[in-house]
Amino acid sequence: MKKCRFLVLLLLAFVGLAACSSQKSSTETGSSKLNVVATNSIIADITKNIAGDKINLHSIVPVGQDPHEYEPLPEDVKKTSQADLIFYNGINLETGGNAWFTKLVENAKKKENKDYYAVSEGVDVIYLEGQSEKGKEDPHAWLNLENGIIYAQNIAKRLSEKDPANKETYEKNLKAYVEKLSALDKEAKEKFNNIPGEKKMIVTSEGCFKYFSKAYNVPSAYIWEINTEEEGTPDQIKTLVEKLRKTKVPSLFVESSVDDRPMKTVSKDTNIPIYAKIFTDSVAEKGEEGDSYYSMMKYNLEKIAEGLSK
């Protein structure tokens, strides 16, 4: 059913494109700005920090929605077709699940490493462990700030290649942004070093904090491993509850983009409170705390450190 709906949306969008053939890529129209598409709000924000007002930027997956499985709207199809440059996460995020991004770029006749690029290129990939997804890549690399820096470097490189006239601006913005992220990363490592070992475990609904765990030496536990599998089954909850009863973990966390009911059940069964909602697959709405990649990571780091220090 999803596939049929997706194809209908594609057809409608391309009909609209045919009727508006004057709206093309910046190269074809002579526009001074690149048309750039990012698959989600995190990648879009990093891109914005590098490019500023030098590009026209469209983000596909709306704030607060799950990028693992998404159904592009006609506007997304149109923007993708017109794009000079497309940034996606890769490593099993948009190309896993219902493979919505693969279908989108194929229908837009875009080519990998010419029109669209994975911003995660160069990341030290961590793999999933559960039976249903074992051996597949864990996509949540951005939850390690060092990987966020790699994302920014890849974005700046591709922008400079496509738009050499603004290369100096992109490189200057990259330098300032990397310094900002590096300072936060250093602060986080110092903060987590001071938390007692028996309290040091981040417990979330989705098992998306493996990169975070490795970077900041904080073991992780979860109800389900990735959002493309079953979420919050009785067996999943039971397994986590049994694990937590053997620990001294003081706080639980729930992600802003998932149903919080399974974690509430875990909290009730273990008598461990949910300390805070944290961000994983999306930034917050504009004007709210966590509405950029930097501020969402700063918020996460502060809340997790506070919760584990209880």
UniProtKB/Swiss-Prot annotation:
GO term, biological process aspect, one: cell adhesion
Subcellular location: Cell membrane
Regions that span the bilayer: none
GO CC, alphabetical: plasma membrane
Membrane topology: Lipid-anchor
NCBIfam families named in the record: ABC_lipo_SloC
Biological function: Part of an ATP-binding cassette (ABC) transport system involved in metal import. Binds a metal with high affinity and specificity and delivers it to the membrane permease for translocation into the cytoplasm. Part of an ATP-driven transport system for manganese. Does not exhibit adhesion properties.
Record's protein name: Metal ABC transporter substrate-binding lipoprotein ScbA
Taxon lineage: Bacteria, Bacillati, Bacillota, Bacilli, Lactobacillales
Gene this protein is translated from: scbA
